[in-house]
From Swiss-Prot:
<feature type="topological domain" description="Cytoplasmic">
    <location>
        <begin position="260"/>
        <end position="323"/>
    </location>
</feature>
<dbReference type="InterPro" id="IPR022065">
    <property type="entry name" value="Uncharacterised_TMEM59"/>
</dbReference>
<feature type="topological domain" description="Extracellular">
    <location>
        <begin position="36"/>
        <end position="238"/>
    </location>
</feature>
<keyword id="KW-0732">Signal</keyword>
<dbReference type="GO" id="GO:0000139">
    <property type="term" value="C:Golgi membrane"/>
</dbReference>
<comment type="similarity">
    <text>Belongs to the TMEM59 family.</text>
</comment>
<protein>
    <recommendedName>
        <fullName>Transmembrane protein 59</fullName>
    </recommendedName>
</protein>
<keyword id="KW-0597">Phosphoprotein</keyword>
<feature type="signal peptide">
    <location>
        <begin position="1"/>
        <end position="35"/>
    </location>
</feature>
<feature type="short sequence motif" description="ATG16L1-binding motif">
    <location>
        <begin position="263"/>
        <end position="281"/>
    </location>
</feature>
<feature type="transmembrane region" description="Helical">
    <location>
        <begin position="239"/>
        <end position="259"/>
    </location>
</feature>
<keyword id="KW-0325">Glycoprotein</keyword>
<feature type="glycosylation site" description="N-linked (GlcNAc...) asparagine">
    <location>
        <position position="90"/>
    </location>
</feature>
<dbReference type="GO" id="GO:0000137">
    <property type="term" value="C:Golgi cis cisterna"/>
</dbReference>
<dbReference type="GO" id="GO:0005765">
    <property type="term" value="C:lysosomal membrane"/>
</dbReference>
<keyword id="KW-0472">Membrane</keyword>
<dbReference type="GO" id="GO:0006914">
    <property type="term" value="P:autophagy"/>
</dbReference>
Length: 323
């Protein structure tokens, strides 16, 4: 038949390895035994094959060529999807239909092969969705948990360097100062031991006395525990208090430095310029010339041509005059 030959040519056009081509050719002639080895790689086509068997039953279609063409269409779709890495299933369907057109010359076989490509499409979409759901995804709260774990590790490492200790300074008779340093010891109050009493042998007065003593001791224990609770909490959580104080101090110092460096625009005072530059700017604003052009004024008077000058004043001898 011409169908296996056409199928080999289509698979060669898809660029598959020679071993895979040989296996597919054997699968076309000897059944589905050899093709089952590639189901994990090419995808399962059993559902598509069952759809082809329901579409082309042997009691209705006595010829097996159309059934085989439909099943080969399912296989061609899987091969095209494997070659294209399953990026676009619509493109894979078009390639499968073109391969069916080139592989089969009879219109009935071509239609059956196209039907196999169409039947394999929903199963391929379902398998792709299942693969996408199996991919690991980052949760939205993962950055917060990562920051929290990093902060807790940093606080634990910082707390390990901080040690609390008690220091006592004593002055001896000879004037020397003796220093005692030790770690604080945690003392737990002893638990109250209940005395075993026999209800048959003990009297009512003894029971009331024991209950009164136990209640009074329990009350004294609670009062001591409340008075020492705050100091004990400070001694146990001194590392956290010091760490928090250190972090807050660093943040306050950074804020003070940033506030001192950054000055607001409206609070910025420009430096005072020299007076000569101020006068120059004033002249430029008033559009005055720096050196005005000198002006020469000439005054002319009209005199008569024949006018003579008057007589000179008489000379007076100052020695003969009386003042």
């Amino acid at each position: 038949m011409a169908a296996p030959k056409g199928k080999l040519w289509v698979q060669a056009q898809l660029g598959l390895p020679p071993l895979l081509l040989l296996t597919m050719a054997l699968a076309g002639g000897s059944g589905t035994a050899a093709a089952e080895a590639f189901d994990s790689v090419l995808g399962d086509t059993a559902s598509c094959h069952r759809a082809c068997q329901l579409t082309y039953p042997l009691h209705t279609y006595p010829k097996e060529e159309e059934l085989y063409a439909c099943q080969r269409g399912c296989r061609l779709f899987s091969i095209c999807q494997f070659v294209d890495d399953g990026l676009d299933l619509n493109r894979t369907k078009l390639e499968c239909e073109s391969a069916c057109t080139e592989a089969y010359s009879q219109p009935d076989e071509q239609y059956a092969c196209h039907l196999g490509c169409q039947d394999q499409l929903p199963f391929a979409e379902l398998r792709q969705e299942q693969l996408m759901s199996l991919m690991p995804r980052m949760h939205l709260l993962f950055p917060l948990t990562l920051v929290r774990s990093f902060w807790s590790d940093m606080m634990d490492s910082a707390q390990s360097f901080i040690t609390s200790s008690w220091t006592f300074y004593l002055q001896a008779d000879d004037g020397k100062i003796v220093i005692f340093q030790s770690k604080p010891e945690i003392q737990y109050a002893p638990q109250l031991e209940q005395e075993p009493t026999n209800l048959r042998e003990s009297s009512l007065s003894k029971m009331s006395y024991l209950q009164m003593r136990n209640s009074q001791a329990h009350r004294n224990y609670l009062e001591e525990e409340e008075s020492d609770g705050f100091l004990r909490c400070l001694s146990l959580n001194s590392g956290w208090i010091l760490t928090t104080t250190l972090v807050l101090s660093v943040m306050v110092l950074l804020w003070i430095c940033c506030a001192a460096v950054a000055t607001a625009v409206e609070q910025y005072v420009p430096p005072e310029k020299l007076s000569i530059y101020g006068d120059l700017e004033f002249m430029n604003e008033q559009k005055l010339s720096r050196y005005p052009a000198p002006s020469l004024v000439i005054v002319r008077s009209q005199t008569e041509e024949h006018e003579e000058a008057g007589p000179l004043p008489t000379k007076v001898n100052l020695a003969h005059s009386e003042i």
